[in-house]
């Protein structure tokens, strides 16, 4: 058979519900409040056909620009040939969830502010707050007192017939 050109082509596993996650949607989905500027992850819920985003937006992160009674408007970057275009799409709230992509950054900002305040109140200079890669291990000496060096040599190859 030839490939169909349907909107939902190739979404058999993408839009499938998770194992043991079928049935009525939790109320927390509807009670979550979204505001303009919030970052959200688009995760299409196959149980709801209304307000479903196109498959190219599944798994993307976008910023909310409009909130209505039953849906939200989201700006998502989409690559079209060589360009990255900001696309504005309207999606129902069953298909989105708040993104956790900034939680690490916001926690780091909060901890840095606390470190700054503590240093200022103690009258000390502000410590280096930038993240650094893990440094190489420090130098150490290996003693041969109770640790005799072992001579390693390859085993001789023997043909077993």
Swiss-Prot record:
UniProt entry keywords in alphabetical sequence: Ribonucleoprotein, Ribosomal protein
GO biological process, one term: translation
Domain of life according to the entry: Eukaryota
InterPro entries xref list: Ribosomal_eL21 (IPR001147), Ribosomal_eL21_CS (IPR018259), Ribosomal_eL21_sf (IPR036948), Translation_prot_SH3-like_sf (IPR008991)
Matches recorded under PROSITE patterns: RIBOSOMAL_L21E
Molecular function in Gene Ontology: structural constituent of ribosome
GO cellular component: a single term: cytosolic large ribosomal subunit
Disulfide bonds: none
A Pfam family assignment: Ribosomal_L21e
PANTHER family given in the database record: 60S RIBOSOMAL PROTEIN L21
Similarity annotation: Belongs to the eukaryotic ribosomal protein eL21 family.
Protein name: Large ribosomal subunit protein eL21
Gene this chain is encoded by: rpl-21
């Amino acid at each position: 058979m030839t490939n169909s050109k349907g909107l939902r082509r190739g979404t058999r596993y993408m839009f499938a519900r998770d194992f043991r996650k079928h049935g009525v949607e939790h109320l927390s989905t509807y009670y979550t409040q979204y505001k303009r500027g919030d970052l959200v992850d688009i995760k299409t819920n196959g149980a709801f056909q209304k307000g479903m985003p196109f498959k190219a937006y599944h798994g993307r992160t976008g910023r909310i620009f409009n909130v209505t009674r039953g849906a939200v408007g989201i700006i998502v970057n989409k690559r079209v040939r060589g360009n990255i275009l900001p696309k504005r799409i309207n999606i129902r709230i069953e298909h989105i969830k708040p993104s956790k992509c900034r939680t690490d950054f916001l926690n780091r900002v909060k901890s840095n502010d606390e470190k700054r305040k503590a240093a200022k109140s103690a009258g000390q200079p502000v410590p280096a707050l930038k993240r650094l890669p893990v440094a190489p291990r420090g130098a150490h000496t290996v003693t041969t007192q109770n640790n005799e060096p072992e001579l390693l040599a390859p085993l001789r190859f023997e043909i077993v017939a």
